[in-house]
Amino acid sequence: MLSAVLAAPLAAQDSAFRALQDRGKTAMGVDQYTSLHRFDPLPDGGRIALVRDSTDAAGVATIRAHLWDISRAFAAGEFAVPGFVHGREVPGTRVMAVRKNAIRYVFHPLPGGGEVRIVTRDSAAVRAVHDFLAFQRMDHRVDGNAPHRH
């Protein structure tokens, strides 16, 4: 009986995670199960990195386009994409939107994908970025700062 009680929440979590992954594929255009994600907090902000097999030229181009697009959207204070992927307002985004003029979002290509470097000297913005990245790590089931294959 206890195993049935425990299995129900796990099934709901797995179902919720699959739904998150499906929304992520819709938003990003690539299968997150075949990609590596990082959400790294840094003293002056953080970084979001997404890479896949570098021989998949179309997938790499799609990742780079997505990261470029979110760097521009985030700079404008627009966080609809993470809201859609996670099915809710993502922690930190409200402050990041208000303090958008104090935060830089810089896209860099990487082998197999790219990264968005998030840079600020504003302490409230740094805390918000760290909240945003911590939520991303939790919801995407990324352990610490290690690269994670979904």
Predicted regions, residues:
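Intrinsically disordered, low-complexity terminal tails/loops enriched in metal-binding residues
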Residues: 12-150
